[in-house]
Amino acid sequence: MHNARPLIIKSYLRSLPRHINGNEKIDALTYFAEGAAKCGDSASVTNSQTYETCDVGAIIGNAFDANPSKVRLPHYQVRKMVMDTQHSLHRYWLSIDSNVFIYKNAANPHKYLRYSFNGVFPATGIYCNETPGTENWNNMRRDYNMDLKPWRSSGNHILICLQRPLGWSMRGVDLMKWLKRTLSRIRENSDRPILIRWHPGDWKAFPNYKSTLVKFGVTVSPQNRHITEDLVNCWAVVCHNSTPSAVAPIEGIPAFITDEPAYSQGGDIANTDLSQIENPHMPDREQWIRKLAQCHWSFEDVRSGRCWSHMRNWVKVS
C-alpha cells in the first residue's frame, strides 16, 4: 500500500436516477467497491442521500450541468453533494463516465467505462495515465478487434460534429453561435462539402434548431446513422471538444477542435487552427492512444481490483 492506513471508499448508488435501463451503472459502482476491498481498503456501497465520510466518493457521471430541470433531480443533488464535500475537504471524488471507444460496439460486452478523480476533462481530472503502459490498450484492441487505422491519404467532405445545445461540455459556449463562427472560418479556407452530425443523444431538441441549420446551407446526417458512415471519404472532423475528436484519429481522420486541447480527449493530437483545414497535422498517435486506453477499465478489471490497484497510487491522504 502507498498510504499508511486503509482508505475509506464509498460508492453512492443514489448518484443514479431512480429509473434506469439495465444494471450496468449499478454494477459499475458495486464492482468498484468490491475491487477496492480486494486491495485491502475499507470499501462499501451506500444507498444514502447524505454524505458519508470517505477518502474517495464514487459516483456515476458528474454534476456540472446548469440546466435548471436537472439540478433539482435527487440523483444530481447527490452527485453535487459528493463532489462539493470532497472538494472542500481536499479529498477525492471518482467519476465513472462514458466509454470513448463505445462506437466500436454499442453493446459494450466487456463493460469498459472511463474512470477519473476530481474531474472529467483531462484539464481538470486525474486520469492516472501520465505514463501509460500497454496492457489496457492491448486488451481493448483484442476485445474490440480494432487498431489505429492509417492516416487517410485522401478525402472529400468536412464533418462537423455538434454537441448537446445545452450541454455542460460546451463550457458556456452557445452552440448555434459556435456553428456560425466555425462554418465561417472553414469557408474562409476551404470549399469542401460540409456535413453536420447532430448529437445522437439529443435528437428531441433537433426540431428547435432545424430552421437555423437550413439557413446555414449545410447537409445534416440522418438520425441513427453511425459515425463511421459519416467518416467514409471524410477529409477532416471538426468539433468543439467532444468524443469525435478521439474517434476520428482512431479511424485515421484528422480532427480539429475549437476548445483548449486540455478539455478534449483528442486534444493531445488534435489540430486547433482552422486556417490549416486543407493541411492538417497528422502526428504519431501511439502514446496518445495508450493514455486514452489507460483510463478505460472493463468490469473484469474493476471487480478484480486491477483498476483500483493502479488508481490508488494517485490518492494522497494523511
Explain the meaning of each model-derived region:
Residues 1-61, 167, 314-318:
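N-terminal pre-catalytic "stem/leader" segment of glycosyltransferase-like enzymes
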Residues 16-24, 53, 66-67, 71, ...:
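Short, charged/polar "capping" segments at the starts of alpha-helices
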Residues 39-107:
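Extended catalytic core of nucleotide-activated donor transferases of GT-like folds
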